[in-house]
């Protein structure tokens, strides 16, 4: 559902995302819990798209995640573009590739706006970026128990000389950490940077795996499966999936036998 075409920007000039979000704040459509959304009317956004891009990803969020999140507005727009200031704008026409952004956000103390480019955005990539935003929000909530227990896993992996990571950012920060000679304290800046990247990347994978049947990339940079499983089991304990949702194959098999 969206506004009639004459109520959305007709100019080809990009509109700053902050202004776009403010202009259509009153037109947000409730989705579920603390989520709402707005879709630009110029888009061919069907009921199937509403299910794939909005309803299913939100429905798959664990209750323990939903209860911690602030109010979140999702904006689906034709294109997001950024200038030298890196501040995002909404564009009705395709920007040059070097100025295209797939996603952007606005955050304050009370609510968060998550905006996504629709045109050319594969639904699987959209899910990944959506859950990456959610994972970053969770990290910023500073859950002491989650951080402490995940940190302990990383220390255990480090002591065992475990190679690899989940995604690019955690791999990059792990390499930086490993280039340091000697032991690195768990409260040091470089370890905290790695802890954040690893938590966000692993949490993104965990949430995406609840929603969809995804394949984990294999290769020399990938965390060995038994260590990845331990991380997912920890996140499953901290943030159990909704009823009838599963992450690990054995959980689905166990449920089917009941």
Functional labels for PLM-detected ranges:
Residues 1-49, 56, 60-65, 161:
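Long, low-complexity, intrinsically disordered N-terminal extensions of eukaryotic proteins, enriched
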Residues 175-181, 188:
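Alpha-helical membrane-anchoring segments
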Residues 1-29, 184-258:
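Pan-zinc metallopeptidase signature
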Residues 114-131, 188-191:
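Short pre-active-site segment immediately N-terminal to the catalytic Zn-binding motif
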Residues 57-60, 153, 238:
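Residues that form generic nucleotide/phosphate-binding pockets
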Residues 33-123:
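Auxiliary, metal-adjacent structural segments of Zn-dependent hydrolase domains
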Residues 124, 128, 139-177, 215-222:
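Post-HEXXH active-site segment of zinc metalloproteases
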Residues 132-136:
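Histidine-centered divalent metal-coordination motifs
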């Amino acid at each position: 559902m969206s506004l009639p075409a004459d109520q959305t920007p007709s100019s080809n000039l990009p509109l700053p995302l902050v202004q776009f979000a403010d202009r259509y704040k009153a037109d947000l459509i409730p989705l579920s819990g603390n989520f709402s959304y707005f879709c630009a009317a110029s888009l061919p956004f069907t009921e199937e798209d509403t299910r794939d891009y909005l309803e299913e990803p939100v429905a798959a969020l664990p209750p323990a995640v939903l209860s911690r999140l602030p109010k979140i507005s999702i904006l689906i727009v034709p294109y997001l573009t950024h200038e030298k200031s890196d501040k995002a704008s909404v564009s009705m026409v395709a920007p040059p590739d070097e100025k295209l952004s797939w996603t952007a956000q606005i955050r304050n103390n009370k609510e968060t706006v998550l905006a996504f480019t629709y045109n050319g955005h594969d639904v699987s990539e959209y899910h990944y970026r959506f859950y990456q935003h959610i994972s970053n929000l969770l990290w910023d909530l500073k859950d002491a128990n989650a951080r402490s227990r995940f940190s302990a896993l990383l220390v255990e992996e480090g002591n065992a000389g475990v190679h690899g990571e989940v995604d690019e950012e955690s791999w990059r920060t792990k390499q930086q950490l490993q280039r340091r000679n000697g032991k690195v304290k768990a409260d040091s800046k470089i370890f905290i940077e790695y802890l954040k990247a690893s938590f966000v990347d692993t949490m993104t994978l965990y949430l995406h795996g609840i929603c969809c049947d995804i394949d984990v990339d294999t290769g020399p940079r990938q965390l060995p499966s038994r260590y990845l499983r331990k991380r997912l089991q920890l996140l499953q304990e901290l943030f159990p999936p909704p009823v009838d949702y599963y992450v690990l194959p054995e959980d689905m098999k166990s449920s089917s036998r009941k």
